[in-house]
Amino acid sequence: LDGIAEFMLEDSRRATIERIAALPQETAEGEMTMDGFEKPITLKVSVSVEGDKIVSDFTGSSGLDKKGINCPLVYAKAYACYALKVAIAPEIPNNAASLAPFEITAPENTIVNALHPAPVALRHIMGHFVPDVVFNAFDKIVPDLVPAEGAGCLCNFQVSLRPRTDAPAPANARRNEVLTFNSG
């Protein structure tokens, strides 16, 4: 199995790098402003195709918000990578190797790089707009490749399995929930 795993990772990495290398070596910016709780929130990104990698830098995005809509960088990275992957390599397996060529940065203590103890419980409110701002920039490099702006790239599928406290025997009764909404 190790050989198969190594092949899959290397093949994914190589395929993603080949896609990136075929792109114009350019830089473009994207920006969007959304309603905040107390003031408007700006998401800004500079996307650069640099050889065999794509660098996305969120310098210029708003600072921290007092409410929990701040994103830890790992959350913003996930959604920025999602946008790039959708645009250039949707059929290539999604794994560490295929995501490695995407470098995502943001200044500390901004809306997309919140450090402890910044409130982040509602990070999805801003985080789900990250793909749209990346699409906005990337469309300037490769026009007509990215999807049109939609529902903030929301595509939520949640599954839960919890013990039932209201159920009689058997003692191991479970409640199942499946929630789906939005389509990205």
List the model feature ranges, each with a label.
Residues 1-184:
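Glycine/proline-enriched, intrinsically flexible loops and inter-domain linkers
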